[in-house]
């Protein structure tokens, strides 16, 4: 105790009691010393981190993202002269997310297979997820497959639930658009999804192996919906992705590994 009869922490020397006056009567009131306050802050940070990790786990669970795409991160982005502008585009998109979200500014990444469109789109998705922003990232084939599968379990209510989850996501990444079956049903569902995002002013990132004209023809052909491509171009800035094939580079690397093993 100090000279006022108040408890003192033997560890930090800080007060464990303070003297206050209420209606003319002085009373001793417990308080946290410096080390107790530090311990409280430490436990609070641990709790906040656990809550953050739990929320992130849930966001990833409901992102519909396949496990193999979780490795698509800017930290794993191998920058070269061919793709440095795409890396810059992706990181700037994430850094300016609040403005992007406000302006409903999406991306239409188009180009030949293997040049990194999907990788870039999922890098953006993972970075935003890390920042606790709800994202759904899935291929058009995978999404339509989930809708069809839901009919077997919940009928039309399953489709409503999936469409609702898409509406709730701050960003929708729709990968490989144009690879889905060329049916009226598929085009109607794609239009419904795109139109809903457009109406709610929520951005999309769309990737396709088709040219812009090829995508337009695929979506708005004889049995298509004329407005669907207009909705996409209204929401998404078209970006041509060029460069060497990442898949070919990966294949060559694996080939070298196998050859090296065989030579031992």
Spans of features found by a protein language model:
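Short glycine-rich substrate-engagement loop in P-loop NTPases that contacts/grips substrate
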Residues: 86-87, 129-168, 181
